[in-house]
Amino acid sequence: FPTRRSSDLDKIGCQLAIIHKRRDPNKANETTTHEVVGEVEGKTCLLVDDMVDTAGTMCQAALALKKHGAKRVIAAATHPILSDPAAERINNSPIEELIVTNTLKIRDDIDIPAMTLLSIAPLIAKAIQEVFEDGSVTSLFR
């Protein structure tokens, strides 16, 4: 785990727990086991992933956290692919809020009441500004 991320967690007073997933080599895109490494009992847990497609992994991870005593589970993903049956899975999971960005258009038939959509427009605008002013785009992600 990168030192910078550990330092970021220390700054905001958070602890790290890791969910180890195992893939079944005989089944494509399917995880089978989720092990929670770290103390989550009585805590609000934030699941972070790069994307949420069918939401199988995310929802299984949320169930594992609740099984280990998590008080609340919030999930965040940069790219909301949301292929079927993602909406159904999320709506029937212990995930209280799903936070995603607008890097992809969300289909009109997707109904996830607990979903919060954040715009990446300010980040893109700042990146363009940095490029035109000979600044650093990398600095936006530090």
Predicted regions and their residues:
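Peripheral docking tails and interdomain loops at the edges
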Residues: 109-142
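Short, small-residue-biased leader/transition segments that mark boundaries at the very start
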Residues: 1-6
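PRPP/pyrophosphate-binding module of the type I phosphoribosyltransferase fold
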Residues: 10-112
